[in-house]
């Protein structure tokens, strides 16, 4: 397991590229402080790691929406025995004990709400998923949220389905 701040990914790029991704080394990379982290200042915003890591071969990139999903993604990452990056934001999370962890199929996204009745679909990942869903529910909006928990690979099946729905799609 390798833990690294998102903002320092650029400094570790060669090692991640050549020694982990291309060699298909079974390393799980925990990317801390992903996203905007105001408390650490503008030099520590974790916004470039996706652009840096996405082109690398053999590397899965995920960002869970909450601690529960993080446990299952971490469990999956260790079971798959291949290069796997898990992004997570600065701060704490609400822990919920589980009896058993579940494998999550790589590249799958989840739909929160009803795609058929929604007039708008919001695609998001990470902790923003629940924040957006809470606002939608509080205001009773005809909007559905897609939890795009895998940044690489994308859920091509769901993406193709969304294009056929003839609805407004917002990628957040």
Set out the residue ranges of the language-model regions.
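Short hydrophobic segments within beta-strands
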Residues: 3, 30, 123-125, 172
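Histidine- and/or cysteine-centered catalytic micro-motif in compact active-site loops
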Residues: 89-91, 125-127, 148-149
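Generic long, charged, amphipathic alpha-helical segments
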Residues: 114, 129-168
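Extended amphipathic alpha-helical segments enriched in small hydrophobics
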Residues: 119-133
